């Protein structure tokens, strides 16, 4: 039986491996680092003495590719979710607190109810979202949606920053539209937030590794791909740090590596080349029962606050503008946000900051148009990763979907 060689054990690579194995195919997985997960990894932090995630990732119940993946690896239950699509916010500029409650069905009745929609917004303001659905690949969000409304400042701006990891006005409108189609337009039942619990590895990574191991597949860790050797229109062999792998007849290769690594391996490939950072801060503190598990922050340094059993974690998206700030000053600002949002005052506990400088490609029109498809110029070589042309921004859903797409292509090419 032919083998599909998967390079990279992040979510895209694991998704591809699970899909091919589920279909009865054979895979081999290679990973340059000592652990799987890529950006969706968990590890023991020596400073805090606990397991933390390198980032906080929020799924929505309508993320169907993630749902398929989690069902296959038996991890659907390893999440915390509210019973309804309700999102709590605190606006630090005016201390206003509000909750957005979406209607269960596809008809947006919540927009007609003043108590459910954004404070000071009007129902007609939401019509601006419809213009996004007609956007082409060369239109920015800022070209279509006015930024002088309460709706923009209190909801749309933070929402688009979170899903695109890019300043909202500069974001590609077609990517925002794709998210809206798959979530908001399907109603509240598709928008229930799902948070990996107790951490990312226990939900997305470890169950996948267990699933694969039970079927005879293990990851070859600490084995970096150094070069791809081509012969005509096919990959002939793979040169790794510790071995050379010659491809047999019918063998395939899926490259599930970061875009900047792929550029060094595949000739003449165009990929996104501008990136945005994500900063996550973790505070060693047991939250009270009154603290919501997820809280959006408007007008502060923090974007989202998440509470876990032994820590409070904060995520800041599109964080390039904060990279030059001293870490102590950054943490002070974040802690001030937490104290204001949760209305308490105490000394800052032990903390840790995790910065991903190239967390995602910049989801602008220019960068989105640089995304390559999963197919390549070579018959047996396919791409996976949240930076590949999935139609979605660089999210967990995009990464998992890209792996499933690459798997389908590998399985269908004889």
Curated annotation (Swiss-Prot):
Keywords: FAD, Flavoprotein, Oxidoreductase
SUPFAM superfamilies according to UniProt: FAD/NAD(P)-binding domain (SSF51905)
E.C. code: 1.17.8.1
Domain of life: Bacteria
Any one GO molecular-function label of the UniProt entry: oxidoreductase activity
Catalytic reactions of this protein: squalene + FAD + H2O + H(+) = hydroxysqualene + FADH2
Pathway connected to this protein: Secondary metabolite biosynthesis; hopanoid biosynthesis
Pfam families attached to this UniProt entry: Amino_oxidase
Biological function: Involved in the biosynthesis of the hopanoid precursor squalene (SQ) from farnesyl diphosphate (FPP). Catalyzes the third (last) step, the reduction of hydroxysqualene (HSQ) to SQ.
Protein family according to the UniProt entry: Belongs to the HpnE family.
Name assigned to this protein: Hydroxysqualene dehydroxylase
Organism annotation: Zymomonas mobilis subsp. mobilis (strain ATCC 31821 / ZM4 / CP4)
Gene it is expressed from: hpnE
